[in-house]
Curated annotation (Swiss-Prot):
One of its GO terms (cellular component) is cytosolic small ribosomal subunit. GO terms for molecular function: RNA binding; structural constituent of ribosome. NCBIfam families: PRK00132.1 (NF001099). The gene is rpsI. Signal peptide: none annotated. It comes from the Bacteria. Belongs to the universal ribosomal protein uS9 family. Disulfide bonds: none annotated. The lineage of its organism: Bacteria, Pseudomonadati, Pseudomonadota, Gammaproteobacteria, Legionellales. This is Small ribosomal subunit protein uS9.
């Protein structure tokens, strides 16, 4: 007989060019990203802090295990995408009868629910970058 699948919530998160699929299960607070623990995957403490923010805000770090697969972008974008995914998974858990539907407003006030729309501006023809032009020479 097949074992019943463990209840989990899925949250998709995006930031810059990164995209993350986050699976939230009840557990002990373990965070696994692309098969590696959080501390091994992100070298910078800032990125680790960003990933933990929604769990810390709701004070539920030790109640859930987080499994995430993330691709594209750099460290900052990936951390932001995972944070967005965790937030969406927490809201899904909450609205399915977890805590009575109060987490969404708390997370929205903290600014975690909204997808950050800022993207890298494209490089223009005739310029060195998006806006940087050639150096001006008076003579």
């Amino acid at each position: 007989m097949a074992q019943a699948a463990k209840k989990q919530n899925l949250g998709m998160g995006r930031r810059k060019t990164s995209s993350a699929r986050v699976f939230l299960r009840s557990g002990t607070g373990q965070i696994i990203i692309n098969g590696l623990p959080l501390d091994e995957y992100f070298g910078r403490e800032t990125a680790r802090m960003v990933v933990r923010q929604p769990l810390v805000k709701l004070d539920v770090q030790s109640r859930f295990d987080v499994y995430a697969t993330v691709q594209g972008g750099g460290d900052s974008g990936q951390a932001g995408a995972i944070r967005h995914g965790i937030t969406r998974a927490l809201i899904q858990y909450d609205e399915e009868g977890g805590e009575g539907g109060t987490w969404r407003s708390t997370l929205r006030k903290a600014g975690f629910v909204t997808r950050d729309p800022r993207m890298v501006e494209r490089k223009k023809v005739g310029l060195h970058g998006a806006r940087r032009g050639t150096q001006f020479s008076k003579r």
